[in-house]
């Protein structure tokens, strides 16, 4: 067997690589720099862990997140890989001990925070060992144009200059615009890197956008239907996190919370409660989750609209990391737009940026917000919208998202009135106005600004007054998503496009999604061509989960570190009767087979004895 495949199987329990992994691994093993852009849950970590195990010396992994370092090192140690992390969570004595171990060549993989790179003690220690690879995780943090710019990442550039013989440098990110990708290559000094961008499609994720009258009531209903599953609920503000958590606790749900305003000790305790499955639901701001590799998250609910598609897809992508079917549900209201704009306008406080750079960053953030709003209001396939945003083509319908399972309504007459109104406002004023002013005109508002601009004299004034303002906003944003309107990213004025003529003159019909079909009419994942992992024997699956929990408690590790839900589902389906059979289960390598095989096989044997096949 090929050496890298042998490592993949022996340590990680998989028989084949995912898209893009092998090319990136081969590049580093051949001494080439590498740059991988892969979605959250796409298997980025294996792209540097396997080369590390097949290379002389040590691999340094630069990572901004204490939680991710802890998680990755814990998982590596479980499969017998000597690994360590160095960050501010360690005491001075622990750091000194780690440095001694590094000098004694006791580790193959060392995770390090970027702030640590240029310290005298770290530089002195690293100078005494052979570093074969420097892997940069969350590489988009090096770009001031990225949504998570961290000035400490710029230390990596200077750190690399300390090496007399430059190691292989690899970079990985789940989200990066062309400008951010250029920055990554420039600041890291990547030398003719092997560049891989894999598909951003996550077939096991089901996307939906809901517009409920009561978000709180909707969340309660969603959680009642998912009582036995683990999930994350993202809120835009700390206040929403606190209020929603209190409400859900009062209703008896096993929830905890996380945001930057909590004391550090409480944050860590709450995070551990979620990771160790003591609490099934985490309510949090976006301060939570980056670097959390909890594989059994069955759903991610966004209580508010995020500020960008990049942020949304990264956060939603924390569901279904083990390949199991998972849900990504966004609860949208017009108030979310106001909150998002406020947060953007008050986010440019990075002292590392000039005023001009801050203005540019804010402008780009507003452009991303426009696309995020369109996602919330589009009637087209949500999966297609996401993939097109990230530069991929995709069939018009996935047959599996909320919009694909929705009833379509022809609203051509209303669309013509809206387009005419937008065109006539521009013709009369000489400039475009925002969506709010168009809605007020169409609904017949008598507000002062409408009258001052003489918008009540237009033929379209009050023609759509029977519709709610939210409904009118949905229609307008749907027209934008379909390409019949556009929003100026700087001034947020809406205007006609070349395609507007298709509706106004050429007779094109326009439809939008208005409600989801009955559940029985929804296409199953299998029918839509998306084969999703499901346990074939639910009762045995539950038995195996209980055993996994026992082992996790005994070893003081999260349950998913022992085996993922997807591995247990495959185990329940295959019912291995020997260690050789056990090794055929996806996600079981030789180390875990030797450690846990007999206990799981015995549990399966006992289950079959009590539940023989009919």
Question: Which sequence ranges carry the predicted segments?
Answer:
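Short helix-to-turn junction characteristic of helix-turn-helix DNA-binding domains
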Residues: 28, 223, 274, 376, ...
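Flexible coil/turn residues that form the inter-helical turn or adjacent wing/linker of helix-turn-helix
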Residues: 165, 227, 379, 431, ...
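Helicase motor core with emphasis on the C-terminal RecA-like subdomain
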Residues: 2-11, 15-19, 23-45, 53-55, ...
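Accessory DNA-binding and partner-docking regions appended to nucleic-acid-acting proteins
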Residues: 1-4, 338-339, 350-355, 364-366, ...
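Short, charged low-complexity linear segments at domain edges
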Residues: 360-390
């Amino acid at each position: 067997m090929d050496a890298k495949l042998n490592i993949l199987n022996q340590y990680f329990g998989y028989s084949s690589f995912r898209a893009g992994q092998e090319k990136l691994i081969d590049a580093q093993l051949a001494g080439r720099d590498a740059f991988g852009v892969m979605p959250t849950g796409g298997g980025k970590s294996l792209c540097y862990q396997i080369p590390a195990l097949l290379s002389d010396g040590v691999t340094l992994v630069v990572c901004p997140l204490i939680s991710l370092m802890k998680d990755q090192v814990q998982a590596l140690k479980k499969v017998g890989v000597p690994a360590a992390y160095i960050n501010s969570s360690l005491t001075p004595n622990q750091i000194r001990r780690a440095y001694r171990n590094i000098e004694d060549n006791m580790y193959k993989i060392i995770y390090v925070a970027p702030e640590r790179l240029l310290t005298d003690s770290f530089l002195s220690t690293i100078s005494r060992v052979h570093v074969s690879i420097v892997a940069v995780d969350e590489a988009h943090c090096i770009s001031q144009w990225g949504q998570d710019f961290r000035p400490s990442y710029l230390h990596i550039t200077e750190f690399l200059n300390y090496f007399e013989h430059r190691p292989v440098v690899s970079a990985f990110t789940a989200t990066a615009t062309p400008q951010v990708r250029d920055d990554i290559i420039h600041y890291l000094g990547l030398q003719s890197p092997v560049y891989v961008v894999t598909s951003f499609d996550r077939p096991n994720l089901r996307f939906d956008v809901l517009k409920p009258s009561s978000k709180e009531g909707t969340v309660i209903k969603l959680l009642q239907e998912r009582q036995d599953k683990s999930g994350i609920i993202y809120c835009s503000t700390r206040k929403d996190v606190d209020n929603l958590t209190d409400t859900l606790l009062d209703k008896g749900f096993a929830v905890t919370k996380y945001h930057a305003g909590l004391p550090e000790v409480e944050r860590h305790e709450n995070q551990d409660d979620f990771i160790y499955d003591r609490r099934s639901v985490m309510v949090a701001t976006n301060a939570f989750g980056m670097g959390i590799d909890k594989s059994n998250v069955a759903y991610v609910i966004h209580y508010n609209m995020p500020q960008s598609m990049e942020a949304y897809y990264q956060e939603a992508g924390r569901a279904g990391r083990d390949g199991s079917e998972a849900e990504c549900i966004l609860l949208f209201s017009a108030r979310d737009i106001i909150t998002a704009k406020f947060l953007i306008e008050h986010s440019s406080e990075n002292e590392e940026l000039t005023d001009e750079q801050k203005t540019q960053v804010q402008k780009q953030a507003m452009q991303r917000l426009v696309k995020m709003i369109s996602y919330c209001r589009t009637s087209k396939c949500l999966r297609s919208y996401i993939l097109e945003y990230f530069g991929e083509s995709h069939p018009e319908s996935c047959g599996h998202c909320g919009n694909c399972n929705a009833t379509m309504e022809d609203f051509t007459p209303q669309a013509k009135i809206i387009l005419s109104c937008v065109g006539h406002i521009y013709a009369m004023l000489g400039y475009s106005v925002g969506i709010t002013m168009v809605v007020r005109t169409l609904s017949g508002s008598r507000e002062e600004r409408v009258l001052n601009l003489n918008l009540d004299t237009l033929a379209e004034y009050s023609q759509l007054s029977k519709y709610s303002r939210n409904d009118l906003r949905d229609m307008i944003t749907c027209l934008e998503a379909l390409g019949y309107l556009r929003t100026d990213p700087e001034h947020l004025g809406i205007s006609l496009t070349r395609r507007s003529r298709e509706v106004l003159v050429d007779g094109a019909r326009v439809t939008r999604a208005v409600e989801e079909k009955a559940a029985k009419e929804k296409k199953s994942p299998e029918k839509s061509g998306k084969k999703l992992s499901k346990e074939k024997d639910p009762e045995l699956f539950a038995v195996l989960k209980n055993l996994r929990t026992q082992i996790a408690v005994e070893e003081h590790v999260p349950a998913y570190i022992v085996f993922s839900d997807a591995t247990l589902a495959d185990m329940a389906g295959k019912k291995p009767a020997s260690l050789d059979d056990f090794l055929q289960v996806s996600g079981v390598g030789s180390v875990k087979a030797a450690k846990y095989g007999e206990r799981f096989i015995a549990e399966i044997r006992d289950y079959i004895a009590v539940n023989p096949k009919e």
